[in-house]
Amino acid sequence: MANSGILRLGNYLLIDRLGEGGMAEVFLAQYSGGEHSVGPQSQVVVKRIKPSLYKSTEFPVFREMFLNEAKLVRSLQHPNLARMYALLEAVDDDLGVKVPFIVGEYIRGVQLWELMRLGTQGFTGKGVPPAIAAFIAREMARGLGHAHAHKDPATGKAQPIIHRDISPENIMVSQDGLVKVIDFGVAKALGGFGPQTRTGIIKGKLAYMAPEQVTQKVVPATDVFGAGIVLHELLTGRRLFGGSNEYLVVSRVLKAEIPRPSSLNPGVPKELDDVTMKALSRDLRGRFADGNAMADALTAVLESVPALSGTTHHTIRDWVRKLTSEAKQVAQGWEEQESGLHVDVQNALAHSVAKGEDVV
């Protein structure tokens, strides 16, 4: 989509496809006039159901899931959650089908998985600085904690929203060092509205799911386990529950020994070790009850451990800029090497031709 021209959806020009999942696709979009813009930014994110599903017999299910996400997310306002501006409808010009779409905040930044890839040297066992890991995990937990503390607007009763898909792909770090949880596409409100998960379908990425997700019994602590996996991988630079197939991954989630981060990275303080392992308790009774509890524990560690104290958004910002700058330099170096090789080959060919040598 990025190089195939610009499409329109309602009053928004879809400029570039930013990503896609099994059900939906996300675009960088520009407000193009007409009715008043629904967001403070001229550039926004537009999320819609993939057009290939419009004619599917499952489209009503996908539509219900999509509308459920919008209902959940629009009630959440927090600095560590990507903001949703509006749920709108428009006719798809190509197919003539009326479809819903979400307009949300465009975060100028990088997905955490990319920062982890750069910061851990491709998951080769080098963890990111513990202070960076702890701060990112604390901000992530704060965003989740806000969702977990959600109340039904009509009754005021507790109605926790469970993300169910916490992974490095669904965490953004902005250019300013702000950490934001994105994509509540498979979220569930306990005791609230929304489609029920059909029997046999597990929501979320297998390598980041909690053991109880196998039996579809999700609670706020379910998200904590996913956050714990992310924190563990940040600290160690290794996949925690990798595997060559889905069965092996699920088996490891359920039974594999979980090493303390410090056993793989001696630079991890004991206090941060303890928080990580508590988040990864397979027994719900031993795990943080929700995101806020995990965030509070990480705040205490960040404030009490000298090696971690003083970490701020500016620290994260500088780290992100350093990583991305180094990545650009490496890429530029490869391009220069390839360009130099191309020139060398051309010179060699020219020299051979001048001497009358065969070059084929």
Q: Model segments located where?
A:
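Intrinsically disordered, low-complexity serine/threonine-rich repeat tracts
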Residues: 197-199, 339-340, 352
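C-terminal lobe helix-coil module of Hanks-type protein kinase domains
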Residues: 207-347
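A structural signal for alpha-helix termini and helix-coil/disorder junctions
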Residues: 85, 109, 118, 304, ...
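Conserved ATP-binding/catalytic core of the eukaryotic-like protein kinase fold
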Residues: 1-259
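Long, low-complexity, intrinsically disordered segments
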Residues: 348-360
